[in-house]
């Protein structure tokens, strides 16, 4: 994958602003461990390049983001609605980022996982870019992975 942190920063800020009305600002890095409950949305890229795009957010922020998407109160949302919303956020980010990748390429449907002390791993891939953002007092992560040759 050949996407820069500048491209990721622009795409994430635009998706959060346009879809959710939430300002997401890049931060240099985070010492924040994935403690507590996190939600991870993963989109796979295939074609001229192969890899994955993973968006990981703390559950309370995921609930707020979903509430913004559905114009609802955070407490009124089911876990399924929160996962659907975060899958769609990852889909929008991946859809925009794929345009910066060699063509032809395609993206998968999102896979969404939730768990305590969650750490997402995609076998056969290496991290090529890890970016952190701050929004509404929370920090979240967007990671790009490249499929290793022969994997």
Where are these regions (language model features)?
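N-terminal auxiliary interaction/assembly segments of multi-subunit proteins
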Residues: 1-151
């Amino acid at each position: 994958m050949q996407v820069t942190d500048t491209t990721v920063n622009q795409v994430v800020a635009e998706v959060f602003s346009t879809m959710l009305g939430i300002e997401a600002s890049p931060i240099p890095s985070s010492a924040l461990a994935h403690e507590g409950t996190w939600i991870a949305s993963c989109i796979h890229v295939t074609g001229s390049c192969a890899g994955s795009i993973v968006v990981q957010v703390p559950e309370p922020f995921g609930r707020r983001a979903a509430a913004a998407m559905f114009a609802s109160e955070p407490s009124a949302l089911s876990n399924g609605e929160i996962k659907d919303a975060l899958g769609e956020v990852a889909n929008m980010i991946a859809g925009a980022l794929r345009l910066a990748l060699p063509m032809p390429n395609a993206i998968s449907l999102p896979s969404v996982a939730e768990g305590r002390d969650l750490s997402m791993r995609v076998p056969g891939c290496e991290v090529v870019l890890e970016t952190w953002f701050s929004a509404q007092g929370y920090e979240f992560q967007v990671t790009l992975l490249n499929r290793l040759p022969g994997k």
